Amino acid sequence: MRFILVSKYNSVNCENRKPRPSAVGRTNNKILTVKLLLTGSGGLIGSAVSEKLHGRGHELLKLVRRKSTDESELTWDPNHAGDLRDPRLNGLAGVIHLAGEPIAGIWSAAKKRRIHESRVRGSALLARSLAKLEQPPARLIIASGIGFYGDTGERKVDESEPNGEGFLAGVCRDWEAASGPARDAGIRVAIARFGIVLSGGGGALTAMLPPFRFGLGGIAGSGRQYMSWISLEDAARAVIHLLESESIRGPVNIVAPCPVTNAKFTLALGRELGRPTILPAPAFLLRRLPGGMADETILSSSRVVPGVLQGTGFEFEHPTVEEGLRNALK
């Protein structure tokens, strides 16, 4: 199911943006204090979302893989073949599913299998269980990634773009399809397709920082490939936006409105750190990473725009890469 965009691409000046008042905390539709279920609460995005939900006064029930420590946690095994059975799951206002094996790391055959299975099996278990509840939630937000589109070159793509090719495109396709039972049960499902989330506390940027801090950073490959990114602050706010909206369903690109080439990102990062960026990483060296990781991530071009977010009035706190990096590195 695809969301009908209000406009093809809302205009954003990505080069000469003037400062404006903070947009933090502003979304269009507010809901009352409610009880919510969250998975992946210990991850980069999950931690930020959890903090914002607590700040709004919402009651959180967290699904965790370890042994639960109090009534606010419920232990689960994403690989479980049955259903989740706990009376606390009834009457939830919404569910936010962010759990999954990290993409970062060496892509061995076992790692790639964990990336796929943790997402597909966990999502299927959750969707299946929610669909069978006597009082199912009204809304389910399930994470995915812009890897859904594959390598799209220099073309701007929004949520209407079809599924691409490659390992990550296949993972995202199966991941999103696993939410089918929830949709069939009448639950409003929004698919959050995350881009590169910029944070100094984890994720892709943290892995890039050591060489850049020592002045050893540079472009990857040709540097012409596009990177679709979003600040952690805006990513968490976007999840809240999906939760609080009564109309959004289907895929939603969680990216800033100003994707940049790897060359521009590299230059911006060097400027923020006050370091030179003159040592490139040739594509042939990057392709020595196992499992096709370089071609799927570092060298893949994704010029993805946030059509649904812009079409539903979401305001970005950090729309340009300079602002996103400055916020992440402060």
Task: Map each language-model feature to its residues.
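Glycine/proline-rich active-site loop of Rossmann-fold NAD(P)-dependent oxidoreductases
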Residues: R173, A185-I187, L198-A207, L242-V252
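N-terminal Rossmann NAD(P)H-binding glycine-rich loop of SDR-like oxidoreductase domains
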Residues: L36-R56
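Mid/C-terminal beta-alpha module of Rossmann-like enzyme folds, strongest
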Residues: S245-G292, R326-K330
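Active-site Tyr-X1-5-Lys
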Residues: E165-V189
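Conserved Rossmann-fold NAD(P)-dependent oxidoreductase catalytic core, especially the SDR/UDP-sugar
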Residues: A124-G166
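NAD(P)H-binding glycine-rich loop region in Rossmannoid oxidoreductase-like domains
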Residues: S68, S72-L125
